[in-house]
């Protein structure tokens, strides 16, 4: 009987810990919504809140017009663990801070460790936005040997023309795969559809008129209140249509 009681107490404690973690993760998502980061859309997986789906739209600089999908993996004890969240791109992305083998983004130069209550996911996404806006400035003061992609750093500093050409290859590839079939059946995976006048035209007109009640793709709701991750892109362009 004592063993049964101890087991129940352990299960109850685990349940409470899990619920508390879910609330903390939800709070992180709400903060991201309130920050209204331009060109970055993220949403937690429906099946696992420790896995997030994201898309980065380059708006300026060398990476303008890029559409890079990425995944965020949170540590098991997030946000209480000092371990850093992991951002992994789904394709080759040439950048001094992106590993050419794993496609993971090195955030350790901005976040040596995760400080619960001080560091937040919106700051991580803002960092992603900043380093793509000005990659050269992002490596200023950092030894080349400490960068994830030394070759990219050397090209950026010494052969910018070749670096730009490599970036353009990445951008071209990203656009070619924007409408690919989702690699997962998770309903929160961010999906983009080609513009269809009969389906999306009326919505576009409401947006233009300032009457649209839609939220951005990272928080679109459907299926009984659950976010579907569904968005759409105007034909000939590679950015989601929104009120922004």
Swiss-Prot record:
Xref: SMART domains: UBCc (SM00212)
Signal peptide as annotated in the record: none
Protein name: Protein crossbronx
Domain UBC core positions: 20-176
Pfam families in the cross-refs: UQ_con (PF00179)
GO term, biological process aspect, one: defense response to bacterium
Family: Belongs to the ubiquitin-conjugating enzyme family. FTS subfamily.
Stretches the record annotates as Disordered: 209-244
Gene name for this UniProt entry: cbx
Coiled coil feature spans: none
Natural source organism: Drosophila simulans (Fruit fly)
């Amino acid at each position: 009987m004592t063993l049964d009681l101890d087991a129940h107490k352990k299960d109850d404690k685990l349940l409470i810990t899990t619920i508390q973690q879910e609330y903390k993760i939800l709070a992180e998502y709400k903060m991201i919504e309130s920050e209204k980061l331009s060109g970055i859309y993220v949403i937690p997986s429906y099946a696992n809140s420790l896995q997030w789906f994201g898309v980065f739209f380059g708006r300026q600089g060398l990476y303008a017009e890029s559409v890079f999908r990425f995944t965020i993996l949170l540590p098991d004890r997030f946000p209480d663990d000092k371990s850093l969240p992991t951002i992994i791109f789904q394709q080759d992305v040439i950048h001094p801070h992106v590993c050419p083998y794993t496609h993971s983004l090195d955030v350790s130069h901005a976040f040596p460790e995760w400080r619960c209550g001080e560091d937040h996911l919106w700051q991580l996404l803002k960092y992603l936005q900043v380093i793509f806006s000005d990659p050269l400035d992002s490596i200023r003061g950092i030894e080349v040997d400490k960068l994830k992609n030394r070759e990219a750093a050397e090209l950026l500093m010494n052969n910018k023309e070749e670096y730009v050409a490599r970036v353009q290859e990445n951008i071209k590839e990203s656009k070619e795969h924007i409408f690919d079939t989702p690699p997962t059946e998770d309903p929160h995976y961010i999906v983009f559809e080609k513009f269809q006048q009969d389906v999306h035209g009326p919505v576009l007109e409401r947006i233009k008129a300032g009457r649209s009640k839609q939220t951005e793709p990272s928080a679109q709701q459907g299926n009984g209140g659950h976010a579907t991750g569904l968005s759409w892109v105007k034909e000939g362009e590679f950015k989601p249509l929104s009120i922004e």
